Swiss-Prot record:
Residues 1-57, 132-164 are annotated as: Disordered. Part of the 50S ribosomal subunit. This is Large ribosomal subunit protein uL15. PANTHER family: 50S RIBOSOMAL PROTEIN L15 (PTHR12934), LARGE RIBOSOMAL SUBUNIT PROTEIN UL15M (PTHR12934:SF11). One of its GO terms (molecular function) is rRNA binding. Pfam families: Ribosomal_L27A (PF00828). Keywords: Ribonucleoprotein, Ribosomal protein, RNA-binding, rRNA-binding. It comes from Rhodopirellula baltica (strain DSM 10527 / NCIMB 13988 / SH1). Residues 21-31 have a biased composition (Gly residues). GO terms for biological process: translation.
Amino acid sequence: MQLNDVHRGITKHRPRKRIGRGPGSGTGKTSGRGHKGHKSRSGYSRKPNFQGGAMPMFRRVPKRGFNNRWALTIFAVNVGKLNDAFNEGETVTLEALAAKNLAKGNFDELKVLGDGELTKKLTIQAHRFSKSAEEKISAAGGTAEKLAPKRTPDERVEALKSEK
């Protein structure tokens, strides 16, 4: 083999495949589509959920429930986690929780629950508090500031309608 033989047979642009040009071409008669069947016909397109004529999976599986478009997404956090994550005298908000990677995602409201021990004096701003959480916060010398809801249910419905 010589250096000038290296690129022999390799072309930059491969010639297009000429189908249906007789048996000698290798793609004559059926033009590479095989014999009969839906895929051999012109205008064929397979639906993404077509399963060969069998009952499709989405029809076999039972359906349950629904997704409530107007439901609030509430992030719940226990006072024990707040005790571990925050220092004495700090203010706890949904933004502060997100900054400390405790609340990941978008939430409408923050709810504080009473599991765990709270020994630090914290100012907690949340939309909802459980009774035990309020008791533990006040026992530790902190304050529980109740925030007004971000949006009323009617405002949420209007916002969703305006998105369309």
